UniProtKB/Swiss-Prot annotation:
Signal peptide: none annotated. Its main location: cytoplasm. The keyword Transferase does not apply. GO terms for biological process: DNA replication; DNA synthesis involved in DNA repair; double-strand break repair; SOS response. This is DNA replication and repair protein RecF. ATP binds at residues 30-37. It is found in: Cytoplasm. GO terms for molecular function: ATP binding; single-stranded DNA binding. The gene is recF. The RecF protein is involved in DNA metabolism; it is required for DNA replication and normal SOS inducibility. RecF binds preferentially to single-stranded, linear DNA. It also seems to bind ATP. The lineage of its organism: Bacteria, Pseudomonadati, Pseudomonadota, Gammaproteobacteria, Pasteurellales. SUPFAM superfamilies: P-loop containing nucleoside triphosphate hydrolases. Belongs to the RecF family. Transmembrane segments: none annotated.
Amino acid sequence: MSLSRLIINNFRNLTAVDLELNHGFNFFIGANGSGKTSLLEAIFYLGHGKSFKSHISNRIIKYNQEEFTLFGKIQEEKHECSVGLQKNRQGETILRINGESNKKIADLAYLLPMQVITPEGLTLLNGGPIYRRAFLDWGLFHQNTDFYHNWNSLKRLLKQRNAALVQTRHYNELKPWDVELSKFAQIVSQSRAVYVESILTYIEKNCQFFLPELEITATFYQGWEKERDYADLLAQGFERDRSVGYTMVGPQKADFRFRANGLPVEDVLSRGQLKLLMCALRLAQGEYFIAQKNRQCIFLIDDFASELDTQKCELLADRLYQSGSQVFVTAITQEQLKPIQGKRQDNATSFFIKDGKMQFM
């Protein structure tokens, strides 16, 4: 699976872009502010219906324009699929897959599985648990066909319970929600635990490859004490939850924590080491997806050389080539891409970008 064509209109400073893409490596070279990151952001938006940089769509639509439009052609073996997304300043979104509307963001996400490595992506390690839950849930969305339904049911029940907490005086009034909530909490948490066990081998292999000098360990916390019954905890914590206005334990508090030589990675690793660990995790998840689903995973890598020396850049390049995936890479100069461009030239295309305009190199 690869993105064979990409059309972008009025997305940030990208007024009109129409690219034929390489199924292997696509390099984008240009100065800061030229539109390199915006191009990766547009690809991400096409596959997720949201940005990895801003939650406010009006900031993404080009100045003095009313909407942005994204279109892509996906090639998978002998089949081709077209996807399109349009967003206006009123927040309305139109999705089309093969010309058919009334599609969901989940349909796009299924068609375009992708991993993103950006300077801001260190939040996977030094940010809040929400980023690590998203990491696990991405994997489960693509791995487990029932997970998306179970996860949405859990979110809906949590929202209803939190709203009911404000109006409820006695726990018996809340119990019907808790019976259902407990069921889906157990399902989601068990799914996450199984996924963690399955992907750990891939994580350990990549950590050894990128950070052999460190012992990296990972621990999954489900959001409440493992030996406790979740339904009992909900009942016992009713007064506390009612006083704060939300449910304080459960899968919405889950975390996937990492330690280096026994200490939290965010406390002891340098930014360069954190980036290498982030790369190890993203590659591990992509490689596990490829192995399980027999499909490619797109990798988006912004500012390839930042925080990494030449040797580490070459290590990252090696793993990306070995994955057999479609890769989009940005850099400020051609020099920064030498460690990755020097590996193979027969499966790569380079573009120069300036003021939102692309030029084939």
